[in-house]
C-alpha cells in the first residue's frame, strides 16, 4: 500500500498507537526524539517536532498519506504554523484526522469584550479539515460494547469564588484553588478515597494543583499503606513517569493523582474510577478526563465518575454528546438538545432556537 505517516501530539499516545498496530503483526517504525528512536519506513509513527526536520526525506520516500491522531490538538491551521509549514512542504495526497472532540478553543473579541468559543473543526477560519467522513456517536459505541458505561456521582459545590480568565475560556488557577479551599474539597476527596479503595481497583484523580496532588498522595501513603498512591505531573522525569504509569497499569499503585498530565490519550483499560477534583469551564478538558474511564476491558462492566465540583451541571451528561449535521444549520456538537460549538461559551442555544432561525 501507499506509504503512511501517523502523527500524534504526545510520546505516550505515539507508543500506545505503535504498540496497538504492531500487535497485529504489521511492521512500523518510530520517529521521535522523545522516544529515543528515529527510523523511517513505509509506516512511520512520529511527533511533529521531530519529523518536520526530515520533510525532504519523506518527500523523496513518497509518503502519500498522513493520519493525525487527536486532530483537534496542537495542529494549528494558521498560516506559518509549524504544522502548516510541514504540510505545505510535504504535500501528501490524503490527510485524515481522528478525534473524539472535533472542536478548537478560539479566543474572540467584539469591541472591548473578550470571550471564548469552541469552534467546530470544519467551521473555523482558517480551516484545515474541510469534511467529516465518518462519525460514531457515544450512544452507538455504548450499544456496540466499545465504551464502558459510566456511573455518575455528583457532589454539591459552591462555585461563588470562581472567576473566568480574561478571555473567558477557563477559571483562573487562583480562583480554582480558592473555591477548592472554601469547599474543603481535598479533605473530602481523601475521605471518599478511603471508601472507594475497597471497591475500585484503579483510580485516577484530577486535583487543583500539583502541590495538592503531592499532599494527597503523601497522606495516603502515610496513613493507608506505603505505595498505594503516586503523582504524575508535567515535570516528572521521563523514566520515573514510565515506572509510575507501569505500576498503575499493573495494579501495584491503586491511586494516581495528577493536575492534567494524564488528561488526554492516557490508555489504561483497567481504570474503573475517575475523580474530577477541580472545577473547569472547558468542555474539552472535562470530556477528555471522563474519557479516561471508558476504555473496555474483560470483567469491567462499568466505571465510576466522581464529579466533585458539579461540572456536569455546566456541560450536561457526556453520554448525551452527539455530533450532528443539523438540518438548516450544518455540523455542530450537541449535549442532548444544547448546542456547544460556534457560540460564546456560557451562552445557551438549543435545537429549538436553531429551528426558529
Located regions from the model:
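Conserved helicase ATPase core of P-loop NTP-dependent helicases/translocases
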Residues: 15, 30-40, 214-215, 226-260
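Conserved RecA-like P-loop NTPase helicase motor core
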Residues: 49-52, 72-74, 234-328
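Inter-Walker segment of RecA-like/P-loop motor cores
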Residues: 22-57
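Conserved interdomain linker/interface between the two RecA-like ATPase lobes of SF2 helicase motors
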Residues: 130-204
Amino acid at each position: 500500500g501507499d506509504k503512511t505517516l501517523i502523527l500524534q501530539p504526545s510520546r505516550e499516545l505515539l507508543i500506545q498507537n505503535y504498540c496497538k498496530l504492531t500487535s497485529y503483526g504489521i511492521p512500523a517504525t518510530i520517529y521521535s526524539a522523545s522516544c529515543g528512536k528515529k527510523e523511517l519506513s513505509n509506516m512511520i509513527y512520529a511527533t511533529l517536532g521531530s519529523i518536520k526536520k526530515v520533510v525532504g526525506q519523506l518527500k523523496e520516500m513518497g509518503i502519500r498519506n498522513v493520519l493525525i491522531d487527536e486532530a483537534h490538538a496542537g495542529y494549528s491551521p494558521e498560516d506559518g504554523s509549524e504544522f502548516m509549514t510541514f504540510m505545505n512542504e510535504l504535500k501528501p495526497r490524503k490527510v485524515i484526522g481522528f478525534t473524539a472532540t472535533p472542536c478548537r478553543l478560539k479566543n474572540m473579541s467584539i469591541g472591548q469584550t473578550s470571550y471564548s468559543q469552541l469552534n467546530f473543526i470544519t467551521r473555523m477560519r482558517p480551516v484545515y479539515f474541510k469534511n467529516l467522513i465518518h462519525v460514531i456517536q457515544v450512544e452507538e459505541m455504548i450499544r456496540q460494547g466499545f465504551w464502558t458505561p459510566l456511573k455518575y456521582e455528583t457532589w454539591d459545590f459552591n462555585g461563588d469564588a470562581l472567576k473566568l480568565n480574561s478571555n473567558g475560556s477557563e477559571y483562573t488557577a487562583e480562583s480554582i484553588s480558592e473555591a477548592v479551599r472554601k469547599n474543603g474539597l481535598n479533605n473530602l476527596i481523601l475521605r471518599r478515597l478511603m471508601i472507594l479503595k475497597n471497591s475500585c481497583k484503579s483510580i485516577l484523580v484530577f486535583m487543583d494543583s500539583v502541590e495538592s496532588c503531592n499532599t494527597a498522595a503523601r497522606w495516603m501513603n502515610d496513613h493507608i499503606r506505603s505505595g498505594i498512591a503516586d503523582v504524575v505531573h508535567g515535570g516528572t522525569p521521563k523514566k520515573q513517569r514510565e515506572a509510575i504509569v507501569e505500576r498503575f497499569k499493573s495494579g501495584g499503585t491503586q491511586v494516581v493523582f495528577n493536575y492534567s498530565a494524564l488528561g488526554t490519550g492516557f490508555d489504561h483499560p483497567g481504570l474503573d474510577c475517575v475523580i474530577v477534583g477541580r472545577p473547569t469551564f472547558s468542555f474539552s478538558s472535562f470530556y477528555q478526563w471522563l474519557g479516561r474511564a471508558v476504555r473496555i476491558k474483560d470483567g469491567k462492566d462499568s466505571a465510576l465518575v466522581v464529579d466533585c465540583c458539579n461540572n456536569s451541571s455546566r456541560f450536561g451528561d457526556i453520554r448525551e454528546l452527539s455530533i450532528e449535521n443539523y438540518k438548516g444549520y450544518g455540523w455542530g456538537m450537541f449535549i442532548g438538545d444544547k448546542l456547544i460549538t460556534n457560540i460564546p461559551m456560557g451562552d445557551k442555544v438549543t435545537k429549538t432556537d436553531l429551528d426558529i432561525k
